[in-house]
Amino acid sequence: MKRILIALAVLLAVQVADAQTKSPEAAKKAVESAEAASKDAKKATKVATWLKLASSYMDAYNAPAGSAWLGASKQELQLIMGNDRPVSVEEVVLGTDQLIKETYSNKEFYFSPAGQLVLINVTQPVVEDALGGALEAYKKAYEVDVKQSK
């Protein structure tokens, strides 16, 4: 029984480590690497190159938000964000809703009066128009994949 619990703990630890979000710096480096590969004449003919580029753009789009998710409480976010503290905190009104806005160096979090995250606004994206870049990479992957295998 003890071995099974240890094996499950190791498996869970590996999955949690794999699920870590990329830092903005790592995401930018991954996009630059994938873009360089897509410009290589030999690699540009492979579907995997374009899928990797699209995936890198998607990671870059999601990187500034970090591990935050909508519906998270302030306490949960403080736990997962570590030393990342807001630069300023203020009360704002969006539409008819009274919200608490926490401003960070590259994003803004908006919390409901109950303390739940309801909106994430990225103020400094890792890559400009990351979603557009991902869409173009997916289109190119479709064009390159003449057998429609992927």
Where are these regions (language model features)?
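Sec-dependent N-terminal signal peptides
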Residues: 4-13
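Sec/Tat signal peptide C-region and signal peptidase I cleavage site
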Residues: 13-19
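Start-of-domain marker
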Residues: 20-70
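Short coil/linker segments at helix-helix boundaries
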Residues: 56-150
